[in-house]
Amino acid sequence: MTDTTGKLRAVLLTALMVGSVIGAGVAFTGGAAAANASDLNDYQRFNENTNYTYSTASEDGKTEGSVASGATIFQGEEDVTFRKLDNEKEVSPATLSRTGGSDEGVPLQMPIPEDQSTGSYDSNGPDNDEADFGVTVQSPSVTMLEVRNNADNDVTGGVLNTQQDESSIAVDYNYYAAEDLELTVEDEDGLDVTDEILAADQSGGAYEDGTGNNGPNTLRFDIDPNNVDAGDYTVSVEGVEDLDFGDATESASVTISSSNKASLNLAEDEVVQGANLKYTIENSPEGNYHAVTIDSSDFRDSSSGADAAKVMRSVGDTVDTGLVVDNDSTTEIVDDYENTSISDVDYAYAIVEIDDGNGVGSIETQYLDDSSADIDLYPASDTEDAPDYVNSNEELTNGSALDGVSTDDDTDFDVTQGDITLDNPTGAYVVGSEVDINGTANEGTDDVVLYARDNNDFELVTVDGEKSIEVDSDDTFEEEDITLSDGDKGGDDILGLPGTYRLGIIAKSDAVNSSGGVKDNIDTSDFNQGVSSTSSIRVTDTELTASFETYNGQVADDDNQIDVEGTAPGKDNVAAIIIGSRGKVKFQSISVDSDDTFDEEDIDISELRQGSASAHILSSGRDGKFGEDTANSISDLEDEVGNYTSGSPTGDQIRDRILSNTVDDTASDDLIVTQQFRLVDGLTTIEATEGGEAGGSLTVMGTTNRKADDNTITVELLQGDASIEINSTDEWNSDGQWSVDVPLSNVEPGNYTVEADDGDNTDRQNVEIVEELEEPDQTTVDQPENNQTMTTTMTETTTETTTEMTTTQENTTENGSEGTSDGESGGSIPGFGVGVALVAVLGAALLALRQN
């Protein structure tokens, strides 16, 4: 190492040391100075990448000064300078750009706009290389603003008593490194009372002038509510300079009261019976317990002990509910609600705790009378105005605990009747049919009951064996596929007979007796006084339609099956009975679908002999039984009909016995549909053909008595034993007429045979396929002189030639000129027209033939 090199290194080392000392002590414009992180004051920002920072706020709390790389800045800030720590060089905000996101590459602006995109910005922007300077932009926000009483409980939105002289306003916000926070308190007239309500001495980062900064810790402004008048106040906070917009500000309200008594506030003055009524206890210190009661005189007459126990709901801040009885001999808290007589109940109570500034509870009005009801609020337990009536389990101590205690507040509210509607069934109802029952009820109605009325009282209608229908949480009710006449109650019987009646729906709470059971009947006056509605319903008798599928009145014994379809509203099933001429019987039960239709395919009739037969559909009618007392069900009827076949009776005898014991029986309302048919051999025939031109098609038509869909008729074009073309069909109507088109695109002219085959039966017919079908050739000849047209039709056969001539009189034109044929001149040879010449030629040809 040379002396020169050593000297240079020494000089360089000395320069670096001096520069470090200078860099550690330099003060920048605006009061910014480098310091160790542990010595920073509340106004300084931390540089997360180093132990150094630059102050960004002067002593008056305003944003001025410089920040170094890694600092966090906020939307809306002004007067912020970026400087490098190592050389004090100022960095232009425009050189920093967004490093990622949908706005990647967008430059940073100064002043920072209120809508500047949040996130990181650096000198490299979206590039991955390490940047020499970068900052992070955040949205300024107040994250918490609460008014707290002496016990440090949140009473925001509630009541702060003037005696709470150690109350405070607590704030959390994220821009403490950029700006101080400013507090403003206004009364209900908008007058600023901040200086008046602030306590003389402040701590927790607050200053006497209503500003403050406690860094990352909660900022507290100490207040004395006794310094201001009672009333409603609004508390607001925001940044002292730039950050006074959007989420950087927050407001809250509080009611300052000089009263020592708690107050009761109802959510509504009028409520529909069955709805829940919210109440709020205000103006009471945090943690107090208050008793709220409703006297039994406001209960519904039909309420039971269990119902009364539900009046005060165990929700919100309610910690205990119950009933107190006073039966002259004792006053006590009820343990057994089910066995408690409503006449012994004195009142229902709730114990409510004051939490977050107030106490919230709720009343179930379903069990209150539809009139005006009173609610009482008692002083807090264990205070100068009331004894300690709440035990350590947060329960009322005993039934006499509130005796002799004056209330802090009382108020009343009106309970009105609600609405209930029955949307279905309405209009017409077929006896025995299934319907959907649905409708709507007002809030708080848990169950509804269906009734029917003829002339007197409303009679109970059971719903699938139940006496009531549950109301869903959306205040609707529905039961599907219900037979209204199925039960054994009076209303079921009413709806089992044709006529016009009143159908009613009523809240279950209005339809129960003193023991809580649903009443079997309710007189019209009581029904109308309850939460109910009625509509008219017309009950009609059952009906029956049916059609058996035959083909031209026949059923082929090759099939030995028959189909039937029809309608039977109000029935679950019907009986199909097919009777042969020799006394054979086929009996089958057929189910009726929910849409009142039935459809049964492939009923086996193989036991029947050929000949005439009858098919019947038999329904039991609205009474559900066959005949007067022949059979009570389809299965019973099947056994009965089986008895009719003993002794080798004829088909007519069996039919007579069935009719006499069902539809023709005394007082019977049975219904029957009868259809005659013949059971015969299967037969498929060819009746006619059309077409037959080579290259075209041949249509083959015929009749059959075979069952469509289950059978296929195949038509084959044969030449000798060779099959030329084939086609088929499995569709034809009840007249048995079928049709098949056989393609002739590859068939040469000649004589052929067509064969129709249904699988069991065949039929044949000879046909001729020609090269071209003959069509009449018409020539029109004009006769211009007499305005006539002659049409000659020639048909040539092997034996003779026939010439027909017809003339038609043409209409003359409007100007009287003679008609002419299209495209021809109106002139002709006088006396010797083309028509005359044609006749002459034909005559000569005929003469030549006769000579030959």
UniProtKB/Swiss-Prot annotation:
Transmembrane segments: 829-849
Main localization, broad class: secreted
Motif segment (PGF sorting signal): 830-832
Post-translational modification note: N-linked glycan at Asn-36 consists of a glycosaminoglycan chain, constructed by a repeating sulfated pentasaccharide block composed of GlcNAc, GalNAc, Gal, GalA, 3-O-methyl-GalA, and sulfate in the molar ratio of 1:1:1:1:1:2; the other N-linked glycans contain Glc, GlcA and IdoA. O-linked glycans consist of Glc-Gal disaccharides.
Residues of the signal peptide: 1-34
Family: Belongs to the halobacterial S-layer protein family.
Protein name: Cell surface glycoprotein
Organism in which the protein naturally occurs: Halobacterium salinarum (strain ATCC 29341 / DSM 671 / R1)
